[in-house]
């Protein structure tokens, strides 16, 4: 710590021996050693404190740089968000107020009036669709109409016989009114006899409990001893 050489130390020791004497010199040397040790520890602690402060300063600088970079990124993101909001506001302001509203629907768009009843046009459209689905019936009706007109224009056919009339009535009656067999079901009330539950008397229950509480005797094994 101090720039003392061997000659300086010998010179200081001679002066201390002359001033203090041989009796007080060892105690003075121990005191000087303790003081020098305290001084060295103090210098070491001061040096460590300086090193700690330097490290803290470096960490503080790094923290400040990191915070500055984070603030810069935050500002750039905020500017980007502000620009996007401004563009959206410009686009929305460019539209007319009625263009912003969704398309309004009325009951007429669904083919019904205010009370929920379908329009006649919708009913006719439904009937037309049904007639398109079943064209055979319409062709059958037109064929019957043409047949009737042809019969009126042509000569009348001869009257059918009694046998033909009876056969036709039988077929039409069987086709129009099918026979339905009815089955009569009668219900007879019968009393159901419920079995009487089997209940044991209190005396029998007490006897069975006592029998269960009795200690059960166990057979002890018997050892056989052979006689010599």
Swiss-Prot record:
Keywords: Cell inner membrane, Cell membrane, Membrane, Protein transport, Translocation, Transmembrane, Transmembrane helix, Transport. It is found in: Cell inner membrane. The keyword tRNA processing does not apply. GO terms for cellular component: TAT protein transport complex. It is a single-pass membrane protein. InterPro entries: TatA/B/E, TatB. It holds the Pfam family TatA_B_E. It comes from the Bacteria. Its main location: membrane. Residues 138-162, 195-228 are annotated as: Disordered. One of its GO terms (biological process) is protein transport by the Tat complex. The chain crosses the membrane at residues 1-21. GO terms for molecular function: protein transmembrane transporter activity. Residues 206-228 have a biased composition (Basic residues). Belongs to the TatB family. Part of the twin-arginine translocation (Tat) system that transports large folded proteins containing a characteristic twin-arginine motif in their signal peptide across membranes. Together with TatC, TatB is part of a receptor directly interacting with Tat signal peptides. TatB may form an oligomeric binding site that transiently accommodates folded Tat precursor proteins before their translocation. PANTHER family: SEC-INDEPENDENT PROTEIN TRANSLOCASE PROTEIN TATA, CHLOROPLASTIC (PTHR33162:SF1). The Tat system comprises two distinct complexes: a TatABC complex, containing multiple copies of TatA, TatB and TatC subunits, and a separate TatA complex, containing only TatA subunits. Substrates initially bind to the TatABC complex, which probably triggers association of the separate TatA complex to form the active translocon. This is Sec-independent protein translocase protein TatB.
């Amino acid at each position: 710590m101090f720039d003392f050489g061997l000659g300086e130390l010998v010179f200081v020791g001679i002066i201390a021996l002359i001033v203090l004497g041989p009796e007080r010199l060892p105690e003075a040397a121990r005191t000087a050693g303790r003081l020098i040790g305290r001084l060295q520890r103090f210098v070491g602690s001061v040096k460590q404190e300086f090193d700690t402060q330097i490290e803290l300063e470096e960490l503080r600088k790094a923290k400040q740089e990191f915070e500055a970079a984070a603030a810069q990124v935050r500002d750039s993101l905020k500017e980007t968000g502000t620009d996007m909001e401004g563009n959206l506001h410009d686009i929305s302001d460019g539209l007319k107020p009625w263009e912003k509203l969704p398309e309004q629907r009325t009951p007429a768009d669904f083919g019904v009036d205010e009370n929920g009843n379908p329009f006649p046009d919708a009913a006719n459209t439904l009937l037309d669709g049904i007639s398109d689905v079943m064209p055979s019936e319409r062709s059958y009706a037109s064929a019957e109409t043409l047949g009737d007109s042809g019969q009126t224009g042509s000569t009348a056919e001869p009257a059918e016989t009694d046998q033909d009339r009876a056969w036709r009535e039988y077929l039409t009656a069987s086709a129009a009114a099918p026979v339905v067999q009815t089955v009569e079901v009668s219900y007879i009330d019968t009393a159901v006899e419920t079995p009487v539950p089997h209940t044991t008397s209190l005396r029998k229950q007490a006897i069975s409990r006592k029998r269960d509480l009795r200690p059960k005797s166990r057979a002890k094994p018997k050892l056989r001893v052979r006689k010599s």
